[in-house]
Structures are given as structure tokens and as C-alpha cells.
Regions:
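Macrodomain-like recognition of ADP-ribose-binding/processing modules
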Residues: 1-139
Length: 139
């Protein structure tokens, strides 16, 4: 169980800042910061992929294959994609590709790419009917 650090009431509900394993937190939607290959090979995304089980990796690989047929990355920087949560205790899983601070080619556009990533995230959230609680790590 995660430890609650800060709780704030806001116009649309409650915001909680927590520390712990987000894959075990109750919520309707889990958001994971992903790379543009949707590979789930490092950081929070790796933990999410491991908790979701091998079906998630197979599913994201299928997305990658289909997008590459159109000469597109599986999920471009600033984009988000919804997948089933598989073994996770959430209704939906959203993968969001934010800018990579390790890539100098993204330095000049980092703020715009981050804004685009959050905008895409909120668009995907709007597509999900059951969205009462969102588990969202920093992107």
C-alpha cells in the first residue's frame, strides 16, 4: 500500500500525492510513462509491464507492428495510447510518451512535447467511460 504524502481538495474532487507501488493502487485508470516503442523496458513502465503480465507486451508489440506498417513509431513523443490492463487491478491502462531528458535533440522542444503529452493523455482519459480515479505518476 502506498503512503499518502499530501491530500488536497479541488473543484473536481481530491488530489493525493503518494509514494509506493502504483501498480497496486486502486483506481479506474493507470497511466504509465512509456517510450516511443511501447517496450516497457525501463523505469515505471517496466514495473507496469511486469505487473500486467506477458499479455501486455504482446499487445503493445501488436500496436507497434500495425503502426510500423504505416511508417509510424508505435507511439510518438507527445502521444498516448490506451490498452487493456491485463493483470493490473485497473479498468484501463494509458501509455504516454513524454520527452526524454536524455535526448539532446528534444532539448529545444521539451516544454511543447510535454504539453502535447499531457494533452494527449487527457484526450485518452476523455475516451474512457469509467474514469473516477486516475493513478498518474509524473511523466
Amino acid at each position: 500500500m502506498a503512503e499518502t504524502i499530501i491530500v488536497r481538495e479541488c473543484q473536481f474532487g481530491q488530489v493525493r500525492f503518494m509514494y509506493g507501488d502504483l501498480t497496486k493502487e486502486e483506481g479506474d485508470i493507470l497511466v504509465t510513462p512509456a517510450n516511443n516503442r511501447l517496450a516497457g523496458r525501463e523505469g515505471v513502465d517496466e514495473v507496469v509491464h511486469q505487473a500486467a503480465g506477458p499479455e501486455l507486451r504482446k499487445h503493445t508489440h501488436g500496436i507497434a507492428v500495425e503502426r510500423r506498417k504505416e511508417n509510424l513509431p508505435p507511439c510518438g513523443v507527445g502521444e498516448a495510447v490506451i490498452t487493456p490492463p491485463f493483470s493490473l487491478p485497473h479498468s484501463s491502462l494509458i501509455h504516454v510518451v513524454g520527452p526524454d531528458c536524455r535526448r539532446p535533440t528534444q532539448d529545444n522542444d521539451r516544454r511543447e512535447l510535454l504539453k502535447a503529452a499531457y494533452a494527449s493523455l487527457f484526450e485518452r482519459i476523455g475516451e474512457i467511460e469509467n474514469r473516477g480515479t486516475i493513478v498518474l505518476p509524473p511523466l
